[in-house]
Amino acid sequence: MFGKGGLGNLMKQAQQMQERMQKMQEEIAQLEVTGESGAGLVKVTINGAHNCRRVEIDPSLMEDDKDMLEDLIAAAFNDAARRADELQKEKMASVTAGMPIPPGFKMPF
């Protein structure tokens, strides 16, 4: 099934990939992305681990409807989370490049 040294090479590749993925996950957790809603009136900045770092609200919204403001904050957070997920996929793709991973396989991170 495995050629000469094939299993050993496969295990070595898997270990190297795991180490690269761990390092990349640590880097991603430190990155910050900002999501926006209401044409930039509300901005939410989160890190790669989806922890909220900052919320910015344009002063003009403080006089408006509370429900609308809450919706805008939620939308901005969701936008930031989507951007963080996309960034994570891009970064991890560079780690798994060349590995025989089936299409659509969801990585455990």
Swiss-Prot record:
Residues 1-21 are annotated as: Disordered. GO terms for molecular function: DNA binding. InterPro entries: YbaB-like_sf, YbaB/EbfC. Keywords: Cytoplasm, DNA-binding. Disulfide bonds: none annotated. It is found in: Cytoplasm, Nucleoid. It comes from the Bacteria. GO terms for cellular component: bacterial nucleoid; cytosol. It holds the Pfam family YbaB_DNA_bd. Binds to DNA and alters its conformation. May be involved in regulation of gene expression, nucleoid organization and DNA protection. Belongs to the YbaB/EbfC family. Homodimer. NCBIfam families: DNA_YbaB_EbfC. This is Nucleoid-associated protein MS1507. The lineage of its organism: Bacteria, Pseudomonadati, Pseudomonadota, Gammaproteobacteria, Pasteurellales.
